[in-house]
Amino acid sequence: MNAPHRDDGFFTESLSSRDPELFASITGELGRQRDEIELIASENIVSRAVMEAQGSVMTNKYAEGYAGKRYYGGCDYVDVAETLAIERAKQLFGCAYVNVQPNSGSQANQGVFQALIKPGDTILGMELASGGHLTHGAAPNQSGKWFNAIQYGVRQQDQLIDYDQVAALAREHKPKLIIAGGSAIPRQIDFARFRAIADEVGALLMVDMAHFAGLVAGGAHPSPFPHADVATTTTHKTLRGPRGGMILTNSEEIAKKVNSAIFPGIQGGPLMHVIAAKAVAFGEALRPEFKAYAAQVVKNAQALADELMKGGLDIVTGGTDTHLMLVDLRPKGVKGNATEKALGRAHITCNKNGIPFDPEKPTVTSGVRLGTPAGTTRGFGEAEFREIGRLIVEVVDGLAANGEEGNAAVEEAVKAKVAALCARFPLYPTL
């Protein structure tokens, strides 16, 4: 039966036909991902199954509240999805309570702040310039505006976290919350040391494991538990799920406060299609293959860092224990912004990044940040990452010798090698 208000193609017309302009953008992005080497440390490549869940009818359902206690009817099936995500996450990380509703890592952090501290309270987090995250008290961020944010950094001599400084600042300022973790920390964090410092001053300890959660889940990195009172993470990055956030704890009291902070505190209806995709990703991470993946991510990062150092570049802290590294470009006399663009023209994607004690502006930088999660998902091993390291050195050396305007021949030659490498490891062949 036809109704005048009904769009005949609404339930049947493909995206390519219904919105060719947007479809062209998606097709272009698929081509970019297939044809370029992705080295942005915070990015990964999800499975076909994760994409199916995120693009499912779960997107239609509003579900304010929590499983079994919703403010809307018709939530039976989304309750199943959220419960699966929670139970799988608890199994993955060996913790008692999980909230999978945060829409992002930033909102997960905001949820912890809402739950455990008040505006004006003192927090102690890592400064952005040393590898911290905006949400750990950086001045432009809400966390830096609402709280008395004290910042710790790294040691000049080895760029490692300055635990003595953390302890001294904690004793001086008596923070309510200490935050461990960041966005550009290439070495494992001593959670036990942070716990001891927190206990000494009566602070709660939050670990932001957004970058390395997948390594924890895969047994390739120490867990923040039992040391952390609460942990936050994104669900993408090394965990290889959809873009989103999550909060984990072993404390029933903290869990109750976190649940109230997320809903109704800072969010309304959760994104049930994303939570369904989280459940899929967590199920994948419970498989034996994921343990092998996590171990390979670290091996690949170490191989890449080693090859870059052989090529005359410096690696901050002298290497990596994780999925990421900070490359100090100063030995070659080039800047991070120019290097990011030159590598991009050669189809190697990364991001400019400040290094500790960087003399350059954040828009320029003396370094780039590189990571191995996406390339490892694609199938690259240590041999491929050593080849990638040599290609990076080739572009950087060309940039140093020829300048930005004169490096086209080098970049084109490397782009051809990138194309050959990517062709050996195809992505999404059925899309």
From Swiss-Prot:
Keywords: Amino-acid biosynthesis, Cytoplasm, One-carbon metabolism, Pyridoxal phosphate, Transferase. SUPFAM superfamilies: PLP-dependent transferases. The record marks H236 as: Plays an important role in substrate specificity. Pathway: One-carbon metabolism; tetrahydrofolate interconversion; Amino-acid biosynthesis; glycine biosynthesis; glycine from L-serine: step 1/1. (6S)-5,6,7,8-tetrahydrofolate binds at L128, G132, H133, L134, E253. It catalyses: (6R)-5,10-methylene-5,6,7,8-tetrahydrofolate + glycine + H2O = (6S)-5,6,7,8-tetrahydrofolate + L-serine. The modification N6-(pyridoxal phosphate)lysine is found at K237. Homodimer. Belongs to the SHMT family. This is Serine hydroxymethyltransferase. It comes from Cereibacter sphaeroides (strain ATCC 17023 / DSM 158 / JCM 6121 / CCUG 31486 / LMG 2827 / NBRC 12203 / NCIMB 8253 / ATH 2.4.1.).
